[in-house]
Amino acid sequence: MIYQISVPGLVADVEEIRVLEWHGCIGHEFDAGDLIVELETHKALVEVRAGQRGILRQILVEEGNWQKIGFPLCLMTDTAGEPLPDSVESAGDLLVAFEIT
């Protein structure tokens, strides 16, 4: 199955988030609880952790770039050989955990 991780809207009055650091490259396998990406708002740091096992297949927002809340950050799949969709909209949502500091 194909999953997307989107920019979380967890901090009040924040419309966009900046990607600080990806904690894996394309093809990296994450287990539940692994840190996938660190994000930054003007008010807080946000850690995005995997809620289930998955393989990072496509990064849609590079480090240092800002993106609006709700926009997809990356695509992940259950297996490395799974074909990616033609459009991000056809991907499901990946269960993730967010930690705000």
Question: Can you annotate each of these PLM segments?
Answer:
Residues M1-L35, E47, V88-I100:
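Acidic, low-complexity mobile loops and tails
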Residues M1-Y3, Q52-I55:
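A generic structural signal for short beta-strands and their flanking turns/coil linkers
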Residues L10-D13, H42, V61-G64:
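Short, surface-exposed acidic/glycine-rich loop or hinge patches that mediate macromolecular interfaces
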Residues E15-R18, K43, R53-G54:
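Short, small/polar residue-rich loop motifs at catalytic or cofactor-binding pockets
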Residues W22-F30, V61-Q67, A80:
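Acidic, glycine-anchored pre-beta loop/turn
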Residues F30-R49, K68-S87:
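Short hydrophobic beta/alpha edge segments that flank linear recognition/processing sites
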Residues G54, Q58-C74:
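PDZ-domain C-terminal substructure recognizer with occasional recognition of PDZ-binding tails
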